[in-house]
Design a protein with these regions (language model features):
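Gly/serine-rich nucleotide phosphate-binding loop at the start of the catalytic core
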Residues: 1-76, 80
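Single, function-defining residue in the core of a domain
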Residues: 1-29, 37, 97, 110, ...
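Short, glycine/acidic-rich beta->alpha junctions
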Residues: 52, 81-84, 130, 195-198, ...
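Generic structural signal for well-ordered secondary structure
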Residues: 53, 64, 68, 81-82, ...
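Hydrophobic, Leu/Ile/Phe/Ala-enriched alpha-helical segments that form helix-helix packing faces
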Residues: 48, 64, 92, 177-184
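Short gly/ser-rich anion-binding loops that grip negatively charged ligand groups
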Residues: 50, 125-128, 163-166
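Contiguous, well-ordered alpha-helical segments that form the cores/surfaces of helical PPI scaffolds
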Residues: 43-47, 137-139, 349, 353
């Protein structure tokens, strides 16, 4: 159980610390923002972490210090979320850690006839296309810490809009990355994505931006050994590829085993040629005790097999960002019909989670995001009560209240 002196703060201390984390992230931003806009963003991020249940403009007015119209106007303004979140990332991650860019589209439940870009998108939970919205989340993953910071969320146009501009989903995802590639390359030149993105067009698009792709292939992918023989001198085109890889009868003279403590299977790596990707790849083969296999790859053939599997497995940390944003900071809650307000709400939801992770790290808080939100909510209500009532409580009473708040949060985490 977390002791009171561990946080070393009064009732408003946890709130002030959270706001200071949000305020410090502006230090690395080159853009000049007026004080009023900065203050509005900091308060909005705090409220996203404080407000229970549904988070919308009405709730922001109810819990905040501004009117509803002020929040509506704030949500229409442009803000460099990726630069801001990169500052938060630098606080949370160590400079020398292995990092990569993780991308993952996610279905957002939404109804209404006038919501911009509403349509049918694939829902992994439902296993089918459902009516709603989709956002492409772009995050930075720390392979050594097994954590993720969401950098940017971009809404995906519906199929009608994409068809009108002659664009496919893959083309759109590449355009999103193209717009922010300079910032992303500051973090890493590796992009990690799920099997949907293991397409030649996507890998080629990343190549043109200076990225390598780390992903997974279909289990029945057509892969070939690299031909390492000498030219025969015969007429005709020289042999480029070797034999097709038979995963039930691997040629162990052409592959290397990766040491692993996992007794459930074995890992092998080699450079292979992929017919689907139309290129050489660094391939990692995982075979379990039953003989079934999974295929992972990187378009960087100089990447080690160990890194390929570590990078891909860490990709799942972005799923936890989605989970926390959906459960605690209202990723699904925005009822706006303005694409700018939707964009602001999506990104504020993820950024509030990023700041919370830093707060948990600074205080060595061992419990969950749910318990931290409970602590923030209780602290906010008490702080608001004392400020509005004009009461200056005895310091002993305040310390007792702080201990009770922390104990409640720790109890919920148990």
């Amino acid at each position: 159980m977390l002791s009171t002196h561990k946080l070393d703060m009064d009732i408003s201390g946890s709130l002030n610390q959270y706001m200071n984390i949000c305020r410090d992230a502006f230090a690395g931003s080159a853009a000049k923002l007026n004080i009023s806009f900065k203050s509005a963003i900091i308060e909005t991020l705090l409220l996203f972490m404080v407000i229970p249940r549904k988070i919308n403009f009405t709730q922001l007015e109810r819990y905040g210090t501004r009117c509803e119209q002020c929040y509506r106007q704030t949500f229409t303004k442009e803000f460099d979320w990726i630069r801001y979140n990169m500052e938060l990332m630098n606080t949370l991650f160590d400079r020398n850690d292995r990092k990569a860019i993780a991308i993952d589209p996610s279905y957002i439940s939404k109804s209404g006839k006038h919501t911009p870009w509403i349509g049918y998108f694939w829902s992994g939970c439902a296993g089918q296309a459902k009516r709603g919205l989709e956002i492409l989340g772009v995050g930075a993953i720390d392979i050594d810490k097994r954590d993720c910071v969401m950098l940017k969320a971009e809404q995906t146009p519906d199929t009608i809009t994409l068809d009108n501009v002659g664009c496919t989903l893959i083309d759109w995802y590449l355009k999103v990355l193209e717009r922010i590639k300079d910032r992303l390359l500051e973090v890493s030149n590796y992009v990690v994505a799920d099997a949907y993105f293991s397409k030649a067009t996507f890998a080629k698009g990343l190549d043109s931006m200076g990225f390598h792709l780390v992903s997974r292939l279909r289990d029945d992918a057509n892969l070939m050994y690299i031909h390492d023989g000498q030219p025969t001198g015969k007429r005709g085109r020289p042999k480029v590829h070797g034999d097709k890889i038979d995963f039930k009868h691997l040629d162990y003279t052409k592959i290397q085993e990766i040491e692993t403590n996992n007794e459930d299977g074995k890992l092998y790596t080699l450079i292979a040629y992929s017919q689907a990707m139309k290129r050489k790849i660094r391939l990692v083969i995982w075979i379990n005790k039953k003989g079934k296999h999974k295929l992972y790859f990187s378009t960087d053939i100089n990447m080690s097999g160990r890194d390929v599997i570590d990078f891909y497995r860490t990709r799942f940390q972005i799923e936890f960002c989605y989970r926390d944003a959906k459960q605690f900071t209202g990723l699904y809650h925005s009822q706006a019909r303005d694409i700018r307000r939707l964009d602001f709400a999506f990104n504020a939801s993820f950024t509030a989670i990023n700041a919370a992770k830093i707060m948990m790290k600074e205080n060595s808080i061992p419990f969950s995001m749910e318990a931290l939100k409970s602590l923030m909510f209780n602290s906010y209500l008490l702080d608001r009560f004392f400020k509005l009532s004009g009461i200056k409580p005895n310091s002993r009473i305040k310390d007792k209240l702080v201990k009770e708040l922390i104990d409640i949060a720790a109890y919920q985490a148990a």
